[in-house]
Amino acid sequence: VPPLICGGQSKYDIEDSLIDMDFLGLHNVLALRGDKRQNEPRFVPYAQGHAHAADLVRQIQAMNRGEFIDGEVEECHHSKFSVGVAGYPEKHFGAANPQSDLQYLKEKVDAGADYIVTQMFFDNSKYFDFVERCRKAGITVPIIPGIKPISTPKHLEILPRTFSVSLPEELVKAVRACGEDTQAAR
């Protein structure tokens, strides 16, 4: 599933990419806001671009109805995109709290997301708790768990810092016990 991000492109660029993807028969897309630029304190949308993934989902769903940015409606051309969005079992690092993070996820689903792919997690209880919170919030689309194997002891440092995820102590101990044997760590 190709990711499509808001950052670094305008709505017109996104529409062009979607037209190309549709022409090529790529009908699944993962709609993401994308990360902030390296030297910026927060995400800044591209000129005439989207600030949020929910806006990108709305644009994709409009194309599915044959509605294009210039206001034209092409009755003969309706795309058939299935749209996935990101969900965060441990909360998006930029969210004020888990409740606001869940509200934003619901906005993406209400905008037309067909499924959710979660950020990686290493404690299954966090995933199951997340699914339960989603269902209680009225989010009923499929929730696909994001999986990332730990293939090197360096991941014990890099993954939590980079992706704001936690690692269970039991897993940390098991990987550290493997030393530099990356095959055993896998």
Where are these regions (language model features)?
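Conserved, mostly hydrophobic/aromatic
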Residues: M21, K108, G112, P145
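Structural preference for beta-strand elements that scaffold enzyme active sites
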Residues: V1-P3, H27-L30, K80-G84, D114-Y115, ...
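Flexible, glycine-rich active-site loops centered on histidine and acidic residues
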Residues: S10-R58
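Active-site pocket-lining/capping segments in soluble small-molecule metabolic enzymes
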Residues: G34, A47-K80, V85-G94, K136-R186
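Catalytic cores of alpha/beta
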Residues: Q9-D22, S100-Y104, F128-R135, T152-L159
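Active-site glycine-rich loop that binds ribose-phosphate moieties when present
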Residues: G94-A111
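Catalytic beta/alpha-barrel core
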Residues: L30-L32, D114-D123, R186
